[in-house]
A protein has these predicted regions:
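Short coil turns that delineate tetratricopeptide repeat
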Residues: 7, 41, 75, 116, ...
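Start-of-helix register in tetratricopeptide repeats
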Residues: 11, 45, 79-82, 86, ...
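Register position in tetratricopeptide repeats
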Residues: 22, 56, 90, 97, ...
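TPR/TPR-like (Sel1-like) alpha-helical repeat modules
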Residues: 55, 64, 68-73, 130-153, ...
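Single-residue signature of alpha-solenoid repeat helices
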Residues: 29, 63, 104, 137-138
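Canonical positions in the second alpha-helix
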Residues: 1-2, 35-36, 69-70, 111, ...
């Protein structure tokens, strides 16, 4: 009601956006976000919510392109950094599914420049390495993940599997280094 009485109310728009997001009313979320950007085009809160709208449509690259200049303008704004990190994570997973791990890692590395302590980004980087069959790097980054109590054992088994793959790779490399090239010639 506050927004209908005063469409430019910053507090009313923030409340309307947050409550519509929590209630799953995405059309209203998008409408109020657009309204907020219209009235407050430089406000990071509305810009971060605009990125959320793009993410919801699985337009992660568009979200990142939208956020990059804003992030350069507000390099320490937590809302913008959080939105950029989230879009980066989604985009990296999208690129990984498309079999483009190098691009996925580049996206994650850029996000980690701004959000270096983000464990979710580090874990996702480990997932990308695992998809690219790089067990040592996968293990290093996935160990940052903090599993819930329910998934703890499963996650520990997964890390053990990565360690096992690392060991097999080391054994194979040691074997190859120990052999002389002439032995392969018949």
């Amino acid at each position: 009601k506050l927004v209908s009485l005063n469409p430019s109310s910053d507090l009313g728009l923030r409340y309307a956006i947050n409550s519509s997001g929590l209630l799953g009313k995405y059309d209203e979320f998008e409408k109020y976000t657009a309204q907020g950007i219209n009235y407050y085009p430089e406000e990071p809160f509305y810009q971060a919510k605009r990125a959320t709208v793009l993410e919801r449509d699985k337009r992660y690259e568009a979200s990142l392109e939208f956020l990059k200049p804003i992030l350069n303008k507000y390099p320490s704004n937590k809302e913008i950094i959080g939105a950029f990190s989230q879009s980066s994570e989604y985009r990296a997973l999208q690129l990984t599914k498309a079999k483009e791990p190098e691009k996925a890692l580049a996206v994650l590395d850029t996000a980690l420049l701004y959000d270096s302590q983000n464990k979710s980004l580090k874990y996702t980087k480990g997932v990308v390495y695992e998809a690219n069959r790089q067990a040592d790097s996968a293990y290093y980054y996935q160990k940052y993940y903090e599993p819930s109590i329910m998934e703890y054992r499963s996650f520990q088994r997964h890390l053990s599997g990565l360690r096992s793959m690392m060991l097999k790779n080391e054994i194979a490399l040691t074997y190859l280094r120990a052999r002389y090239g002439e032995e392969d010639i018949n």
